[in-house]
UniProtKB/Swiss-Prot annotation:
Catalyzes the transfer of a dimethylallyl group onto the adenine at position 37 in tRNAs that read codons beginning with uridine, leading to the formation of N6-(dimethylallyl)adenosine (i(6)A). It catalyses: adenosine(37) in tRNA + dimethylallyl diphosphate = N(6)-dimethylallyladenosine(37) in tRNA + diphosphate. This is tRNA dimethylallyltransferase. ATP binds at residues 14-21. Belongs to the IPP transferase family. Pfam families: IPPT. Its cofactor is Mg(2+). NCBIfam families: miaA. The keyword ATP-binding applies. Residues 39-42, 163-167, 245-250 are annotated as: Interaction with substrate tRNA. Substrate binds at residues 16-21. The record marks 105, 127 as: Interaction with substrate tRNA. The gene is miaA.
Length: 314
C-alpha cells in the first residue's frame, strides 16, 4: 500500500525581472492557491518602490504573505523566514489551498528546503569591528582573509558581497570554525510537502539585462529618490543595515550623500541589479532541483499552468 501523498506546494524561483510575480498571479487566477513572498527586501515596511513590491490594488486581489513584516531599522534572518514560511504553508494547507512561494531570495529557499545549521546569533560589537576593518582595507581584502580560514565559503561569495562576507567572518571568529563546516554538519530538514520547484531562467541574458534597466528606470520615475529621503527622515538608518544594503537603496543613499555623482546613479543601480541577477542565476543553477523554464518564452504562463495542473491532479 502506497503511503499517502504529502500536501502539495509550489516554488517559483528566478532572478530579478524574470516575471516570477506575473506567473504566480496567473496561477492564482486558475488554481486554489495562496501566495507567499520569498523576498528579503519586501519584508520591510515603507520600502515599496525600490523593492518592486506589488501595489495595494494588486495585493488586494492577490494577497502575499510575508510582505511588510518589519521596519527598515530591523533585521530578518533566513531562520525566521523558514519558521514564518512553514507556519504560513501549514495555514494555507489547512484552509484547503496550495501554497505558492514566489521570489528571488535563494538563501531563503535553501533554508526552507534544507534547514539551517546551528549558527551563532549576530554579535553587534564584532560586526562593527569587521565593518571598521572593511572600511580601512576594503571588502576584497576581507574576502582574502575569509579565503584563508574558510576557502569553501569564500569561493562562492563575490569579493564585494559585504553582507555575506561579514556574516561568514563573524561566524569564523565567534566559533573558531568555518561556516562551510558548520553548514555541512546541519541535518537536512525537508519540509513535509510534495514540492514542485519551478525555475525561471533567461535564454538570452541580454534581454534580461534590458528588462532590468527598464525596471530600474521605472523605479526612478516612480520616486525611488524621494522614497529613500522619506525613509531616512522617518527611521534611524545607516548603510550597514540590511535594508539599506538592498540594491537600489544603497546606490540612492550614496548619490544623496554625494559619494557618487548623480549622473552615475542610474547606471550603478542597473549594474548592481545585474550582478544580483547573476548571483541568483548561479544559485538556481547549482543549488536547486528545479524544473527550469525560459522566462522569455511568450508561452511561459501557459506552460507552467499546464505543468501545475498535471502536478496538482497527479
Amino acid at each position: 500500500m502506497n503511503p499517502p501523498r504529502l500536501p502539495p506546494a509550489i516554488l517559483i524561483m528566478g532572478p530579478t525581472a524574470s516575471g516570477k510575480t506575473a506567473v504566480a498571479m496567473a496561477l492564482a487566477d486558475r488554481f486554489p492557491v495562496e501566495l507567499i513572498s520569498v523576498d528579503s527586501a519586501q519584508v520591510f515596511i515603507d520600502m515599496d518602490v525600490g523593492t518592486a513590491k506589488p501595489d495595494r490594488a494588486t495585493l488586494d486581489r492577490y494577497p502575499h504573505r510575508l510582505i511588510d513584516l518589519i521596519t527598515p531599522e530591523e533585521s530578518y534572518s533566513a531562520a525566521r523566514f523558514r519558521a514564518d514560511a512553514l507556519t504560513a504553508m501549514a495555514e494555507i494547507t489547512a484552509a484547503g489551498k496550495v501554497p505558492v512561494l514566489v521570489g528571488g531570495t535563494m538563501m531563503y529557499y535553501r533554508a526552507l528546503l534544507h534547514g539551517l545549521a546551528d549558527l551563532p546569533q549576530a554579535d553587534a560589537e564584532l560586526r562593527a569591528e569587521i565593518d571598521a576593518e572593511a572600511a580601512a582595507e576594503g571588502w576584497p581584502a576581507m574576502h582574502a582573509k575569509l579565503a584563508l580560514v574558510d576557502p569553501a565559503t569564500a569561493a562562492r561569495l563575490h569579493p564585494t558581497d559585504s553582507q555575506r562576507l561579514q556574516r561568514a567572518l563573524e561566524i569564523c571568529r565567534l566559533t573558531g570554525r568555518p561556516m562551510s563546516e558548520l553548514l555541512a554538519e546541519s541535518e537536512k530538514q525537508k519540509p513535509p510537502y510534495d514540492l514542485l520547484q519551478i525555475g525561471l531562467l533567461p535564454s538570452d541574458r541580454a534581454v534580461l539585462h534590458q528588462r532590468i534597466a527598464r525596471r530600474f528606470d521605472e523605479m526612478l520615475l516612480a520616486g525611488l529618490d524621494e522614497e529613500v529621503r522619506q525613509l531616512r527622515q522617518k527611521y534611524e538608518l545607516n548603510l550597514n543595515l540590511p535594508s539599506m544594503r538592498c540594491v537600489g537603496y544603497r546606490q540612492t543613499w550614496e548619490m544623496q550623500e554625494g559619494l557618487i555623482p548623480k549622473r552615475e546613479w542610474r547606471d550603478r543601480g542597473v549594474f548592481a541589479t545585474r550582478q544580483l541577477a547573476k548571483r541568483q542565476i548561479t544559485w538556481l543553477t547549482n543549488s536547486f532541483a528545479a524544473e527550469n523554464y525560459d522566462c522569455l518564452d511568450p508561452a511561459l504562463v501557459e506552460r507552467i499552468a499546464a505543468r501545475t495542473e498535471a502536478f496538482l491532479s497527479s
